[in-house]
């Protein structure tokens, strides 16, 4: 059953999908709060604890309690801090994450069998744009560390820089491998071109390299050497309290959701559904985005679960893993992608 729509609505579809995409971007901020709750509940299950259970049903209102706590905490600034950097660095980090959001599609709808991605904007080089915006978050971390005038913060920033330099290389090579298979740097085209044959089946090594490098890029355990509590108190964010801490903390969780989106888009087929679903009047509007968000949730829960299942690596082990293992594997995957692309006629 193909749904027919009035002709005068057809020219408005790009604007409608842009507005829907913008509203979903706003929903991601709520999703970041949900990710905090999921992490607490999942970690509690792994450790045989209850987790949040007192404030609201299933502890859902614990998020509101945390927000009130951050808003009412005293806003402290170290005596010798660089005020300009210290005050504005969390805003810079949040801005860089938001700039990533506008290029990431959060689903798609099918109308009359035609695919309309839900994105604020669609770029021909959206993959490169997202990579660039992700990389500049390191400047926000250095602004925080230098502006804090704290040795632990600065050591954490140096560790972050060493880790990101090492892992951005295999991460970028893996993304190029996926782009070669598609013949495009547009993330919408990469997701759409997979159909029901996902890239995880065509490039399993690339998926492993991308996922591990993405975990390191986000600074999640076992790659959180920049804020290891046993060595650096809280690392680069040691001196922050109140809403400044909240902004940096929030940016980290939004970055984690974006990473989950990228895994689902590049390797798990995005929003692709069978043709009979796409051509259905109702399912074509709901199923693609719902299927995509379900994949994203599963990836997110995997990332969160890794924190409580794998111990933290030493910084030298992290660097060795990048340059001695992931980099050769990413190059091998690149060669495989080129050969496979030539064979398939990409």
Identify the meaning behind each predicted range.
Residues 2-346:
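Selective transmembrane helix interface/packing segments
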